[in-house]
């Protein structure tokens, strides 16, 4: 007896959701084709290079198509010591990566500007190579998180532009 009621409730919920005009963000017409036509400009640094790679992956950039949008970014990276050992050496760092970006239509028009911040922590190692590897790993994780946040922001902004 309970199972038919649950099925009927689920069916009516889906019917109401379809009736309200709900469109999945990545459904047709969606924003995925638009995201893949955004060219990315980053600062000429190692972190900038990693951000370009991460953004091109997140946006699924299609090199075979002409870019409709241009994304310009500016990076601010701050590293802060968090913990100290009894011998007053740092045991952990916090890395804060702030990416300010501007999305502009190639054909001209109003730009979309915003910023995202990604915060990660990593352990400070005693060996020099391990310390460098830990810092780079932290930078890569921060860049990946910033690229994901930018994709989400751009998806939302472009979906709002496509609304009638």
Question: What is the predicted function of each stretch?
Answer:
Residues 15-19:
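C-terminal motif of bacterial Sec signal peptides marking the signal peptidase cleavage site
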Residues 62-68, 72-115, 120-137, 141, ...:
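Surface-exposed short loop/turn segments
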Residues 56, 60, 147, 151-159:
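Sec-exported extracytoplasmic/periplasmic mature domains
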Residues 162-164:
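Short, solvent-exposed mixed-charge patches
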Residues 32-42, 127-130:
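Acidic/histidine-rich, surface-exposed loop or edge segments in extracytoplasmic proteins
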Residues 21-24:
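Bacterial signal peptide processing site
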Residues 1-9:
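Bacterial N-terminal signal peptides that target proteins for export
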């Amino acid at each position: 007896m309970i199972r038919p009621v649950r099925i009927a409730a689920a069916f009516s919920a889906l019917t109401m959701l379809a009736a309200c005009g709900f469109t999945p963000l990545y459904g047709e017409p969606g924003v995925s084709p638009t995201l893949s036509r955004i060219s990315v400009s980053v600062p000429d640094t190692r972190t900038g290079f990693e951000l370009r790679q991460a953004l091109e992956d997140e946006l699924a950039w299609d090199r075979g198509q002409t870019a409709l949008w241009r994304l310009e970014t500016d990076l601010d990276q701050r590293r802060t010591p968090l913990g100290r050992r009894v011998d007053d050496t740092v045991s952990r760092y916090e890395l804060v990566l702030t990416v300010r970006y501007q999305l502009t239509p190639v054909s001209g028009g109003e730009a979309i500007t915003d910023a995202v911040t990604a915060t990660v922590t990593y352990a400070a190692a005693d060996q020099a190579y391990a310390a460098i590897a830990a810092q780079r790993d932290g930078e890569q994780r921060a860049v990946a998180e910033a690229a994901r946040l930018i994709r989400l922001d751009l998806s939302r902004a472009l979906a709002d532009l496509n609304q009638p």
